[in-house]
UniProtKB/Swiss-Prot annotation:
HAMAP family: Ribosomal_uS19. This is Small ribosomal subunit protein uS19m. Gene3D superfamilies: 30s Ribosomal Protein S19, Chain A (3.30.860.10). Pfam families: Ribosomal_S19. It is found in: Mitochondrion. Belongs to the universal ribosomal protein uS19 family. Its main location: mitochondrion. The keyword Transcription does not apply. GO terms for cellular component: mitochondrion; ribonucleoprotein complex; ribosome. The gene is RPS19. It comes from Acanthamoeba castellanii.
Length: 78
């Protein structure tokens, strides 16, 4: 939680906002680009996002893929 006397953190980069910036009312209904570590993702800000950090809306982790185990077929006995 940030101190009240410091105010909201806001930093605008060349290509988009930083993930540690706080969403404020002046950003409503605007589209911003955020870097997720691999590419830039665009985000449209709505009223439910006000007061939260911008980084909460971009996934930075790669989702794992679950593989099924291979079942070996046994050869018939003679």
């Amino acid at each position: 939680m940030r101190s009240v006397w410091k105010g909201c953190f806001y930093k605008n980069n060349n290509n988009g906002l930083s993930k540690s910036s706080t969403v404020i009312n002046t950003m409503l209904k605007k589209k911003f680009t955020l870097h997720d570590g691999k590419s830039y993702k665009s985000i449209l800000i709505d009223r439910s996002m006000v007061g939260l950090k911008i980084g909460e809306f971009v996934f930075t982790r790669k989702m794992g893929v679950l593989h099924k185990k291979k079942v070996l077929k046994k050869k018939g006995k003679k």
